[in-house]
C-alpha cells in the first residue's frame, strides 16, 4: 500500500528537532532530506542552497543543531564537519548573482532546491523544505513553515548553506576589497551601502536589487557626463 502524507503514525513529542523525521521514518518514507537556502535577501554574492539527509541514529551526535540564524558562527563552524561526517548524503549548490538577476530570486531559489536534492548521492524517500513548496521534485515533499527550527534535516541543510556562503563571502572580500563582504556577507547594512555608493557596484552585486541599480545608474550617468565634458582629442591617424 502506498504511503501518503500525513503519515498515520502519531507524531509524538521527541527530543531536539527530530519529530518530523522520526514520524516519516516510522511511516516508511525515509530517508528524509531537508533543503534550505541562504543569501536570498543579500544584494551581493550568490544564493546558496543545501540539501541534507540524516541517518535516523545520528541525531544525538548533532544535538546542537538549530536554525543557523540562531547559532553563533563558532557553533556553525563546529557543526559543519559533523554534519558532513554523519549525513547520509548532502549537496550544496551555488547560484551566482548573474543567475539570480536573470531568473529572479524566487525562481532561482526553487531551481537551486531542485538541483540540491537531485545532487544527493542517496535518493530520499521524502523531502522537507523550509517554507517553500518545491515543484518538480521526483519524490514527495512538504513545505514546513519555520522548518529550519522544526526539522533536523532542514536545520542541517541551513548550517551547510550558511557556512558555505559565509566562507565564500570572506574570500570575496579579498577579491573585491573595500566593500566589507567579510563582515556583512553581502547584505544591505549601513557600511555596505556607504561602500557601494563610494565604489559603485562590483561584478558580484545583484543589479536586480533596487539599491544596487540606483547606484549603477548614477555611476553610469556620471561616467557619461564626464565623457561629454572631456571628449577625446582627434587624431590624424599618422601616429
Curated annotation (Swiss-Prot):
Gene Ontology MF terms: manganese ion binding; RNA binding; RNA-DNA hybrid ribonuclease activity
Record text on cofactor binding: Manganese or magnesium. Binds 1 divalent metal ion per monomer in the absence of substrate. May bind a second metal ion after substrate binding.
Localisation: Cytoplasm
SUPFAM superfamilies associated with the record: Ribonuclease H-like
Superkingdom of origin: Bacteria
GO biological process: DNA replication, removal of RNA primer; mismatch repair
Keywords: Cytoplasm, Endonuclease, Hydrolase, Manganese, Metal-binding, Nuclease
Assigned EC number: 3.1.26.4
Predominant cellular place of this UniProt entry's protein: cytoplasm
Biased composition (Basic and acidic residues): 225-239
Signal peptide extent: none
Binding residues for a divalent metal cation: 36-37, 130
UniProt GO cellular component terms: cytoplasm; ribonuclease H2 complex
Entries under Pfam families matching the protein: RNase_HII
Domain RNase H type-2: 30-221
Keyword hit for NADP: no
Recorded catalytic activity of this chain's protein: Endonucleolytic cleavage to 5'-phosphomonoester
Enzyme class: hydrolase
Entries under InterPro entries matching the protein: RNase_HII, RNase_HII/HIII, RNase_HII/HIII_dom, RNaseH-like_sf, RNaseH_sf
Cofactor(s) the record lists: Mn(2+); Mg(2+)
CDD domains in the cross-refs: RNase_HII_bacteria_HII_like
Family membership: Belongs to the RNase HII family.
PANTHER family per record: RIBONUCLEASE H2 SUBUNIT A, RIBONUCLEASE HII
This protein's name: Ribonuclease HII
Organism, as annotated: Mycobacterium marinum (strain ATCC BAA-535 / M)
High-level lineage: Bacteria, Bacillati, Actinomycetota, Actinomycetes, Mycobacteriales
Gene symbol of the encoding locus: rnhB
Amino acid at each position: 500500500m502506498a504511503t501518503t502524507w500525513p503519515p498515520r503514525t502519531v507524531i509524538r513529542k521527541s527530543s531536539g528537532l527530530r519529530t518530523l523525521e522520526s514520524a516519516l521514518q516510522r511511516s516508511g518514507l525515509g530517508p528524509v532530506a531537508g533543503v534550505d537556502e541562504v543569501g536570498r535577501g543579500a544584494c551581493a554574492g550568490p544564493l546558496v542552497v543545501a540539501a541534507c539527509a540524516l541517518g535516523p541514529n545520528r541525531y544525538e551526535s548533532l544535538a546542537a543543531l538549530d536554525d543557523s540564524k540562531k547559532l553563533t558562527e563558532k557553533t556553525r563552524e563546529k557543526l559543519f564537519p559533523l554534519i558532513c561526517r554523519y549525513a547520509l548524503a548532502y549537496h550544496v549548490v551555488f547560484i551566482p548573482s548573474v543567475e539570480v538577476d536573470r531568473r529572479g530570486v524566487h525562481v532561482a531559489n526553487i531551481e537551486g532546491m531542485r538541483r540540491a536534492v537531485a545532487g544527493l548521492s542517496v535518493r530520499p524517500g521524502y523531502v522537507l523544505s523550509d517554507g517553500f513548496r518545491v515543484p518538480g521534485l521526483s519524490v514527495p515533499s512538504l513545505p514546513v513553515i519555520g522548518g529550519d527550527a522544526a526539522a533536523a534535516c532542514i536545520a542541517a541543510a541551513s548550517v551547510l548553506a550558511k557556512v558555505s556562503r559565509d566562507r565564500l563571502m570572506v574570500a570575496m572580500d579579498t577579491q573585491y576589497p573595500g566593500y566589507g563582504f567579510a563582515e556583512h556577507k553581502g547584505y544591505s547594512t549601513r557600511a555596505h551601502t556607504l561602500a557601494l555608493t563610494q565604489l559603485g557596484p562590483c561584478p558580484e552585486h545583484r543589479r536586480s536589487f533596487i539599491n544596487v541599480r540606483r547606484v549603477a545608474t548614477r555611476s553610469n550617468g556620471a561616467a557619461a557626463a564626464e565623457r561629454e565634458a572631456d571628449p577625446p582629442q582627434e587624431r590624424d591617424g599618422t601616429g
